[in-house]
Amino acid sequence: MASNNDSIKKTLFVVIALSLVCSIIVSAAAVGLRDKQKENAALDKQSKILQVAGIEAKGSKQIVELFNKSIEPRLVDFNTGDFVEGDAANYDQRKAAKEASESIKLTAEQDKAKIQRRANVGVVYLVKDGDKTSKVILPVHGNGLWSMMYAFVAVETDGNTVSGLTYYEQGETPGLGGEVENPAWRAQWVGKKLFDENHKPAIKIVKGGAPQGSEHGVDGLSGATLTSNGVQNTFDFWLGDMGFGPFLTKVRDGGLN
């Protein structure tokens, strides 16, 4: 009888030990996978920023090298448009927007982009050419038909002229609203003026196509009116006083160099 009890105890010990070992292995693998996913996400973000800046990079090593050499993240106070101190490289604006102490809840009138909350501080990316800043990259986002759409827009140091646009995260309908990622559509933005002569937001997404030579007009997305409206609303918000408007005013007045 004692022999049977010993056998059962040994079996239970082996089962428990194996379970513990397996759980440790699974936990370690999950942590490793999560870290790898974060690393890949950061690398993809750097790649998109370089792309919109017009800097070609091939392979992860070159992406990191060129990003560190050519891009300077800075924090901006949305209320004043001033640079503020802080760890811009690791700042999570999405997370900050969810924290009541680090953000504001937008009123229905303010919330043109339908983002609900806006962080108090935003991150911008300065494209460096030696000691000089050649462009500034703004992260913008707004609601489309099916998804929140995230983009980077590169602006010349006049604070007005677009030099590039890339949508890097969106869930719109492929072939319709998803065409925000189409290189041909994005190319239309280059050279467009964000503001009119009175420094008011002026970019317009035009259903049926923008007039030839329009300074402010971009063709609407065919068959995707609501996504096009989402793009319009995104820029209306982020170019305004609640977004990067105060910062771009300072850029226009020579605040970068």
Swiss-Prot record:
A GO BP annotation: sodium ion transport
One cellular-component annotation, GO: plasma membrane
Subcellular location as annotated: Cell inner membrane
Annotated positions of the FMN phosphoryl threonine modification: 225
Domain of life, per lineage: Bacteria
Major place of residence: membrane
Bilayer-spanning residue ranges: 12-32
GO terms for MF: FMN binding; oxidoreductase activity, acting on NAD(P)H, quinone or similar compound as acceptor
Lipid bilayer topology: Single-pass membrane protein
Tagged with keyword Ribosomal protein: no
Catalytic function, reaction form: a ubiquinone + n Na(+)(in) + NADH + H(+) = a ubiquinol + n Na(+)(out) + NAD(+)
UniProt entry keywords in alphabetical sequence: Cell inner membrane, Cell membrane, Flavoprotein, FMN, Ion transport, Membrane, NAD, Phosphoprotein, Sodium, Sodium transport, Translocase, Transmembrane, Transmembrane helix, Transport, Ubiquinone
Co-factor(s): FMN
EC number: 7.2.1.1
Pfam families, sorted: FMN_bind
Assembly and binders: Composed of six subunits; NqrA, NqrB, NqrC, NqrD, NqrE and NqrF.
Family: Belongs to the NqrC family.
Function: NQR complex catalyzes the reduction of ubiquinone-1 to ubiquinol by two successive reactions, coupled with the transport of Na(+) ions from the cytoplasm to the periplasm. NqrA to NqrE are probably involved in the second step, the conversion of ubisemiquinone to ubiquinol.
PANTHER family referenced in this protein's UniProt entry, alphabetically: NA(+)-TRANSLOCATING NADH-QUINONE REDUCTASE SUBUNIT C
Protein's name in the database: Na(+)-translocating NADH-quinone reductase subunit C
Organism: Vibrio cholerae serotype O1 (strain ATCC 39541 / Classical Ogawa 395 / O395)
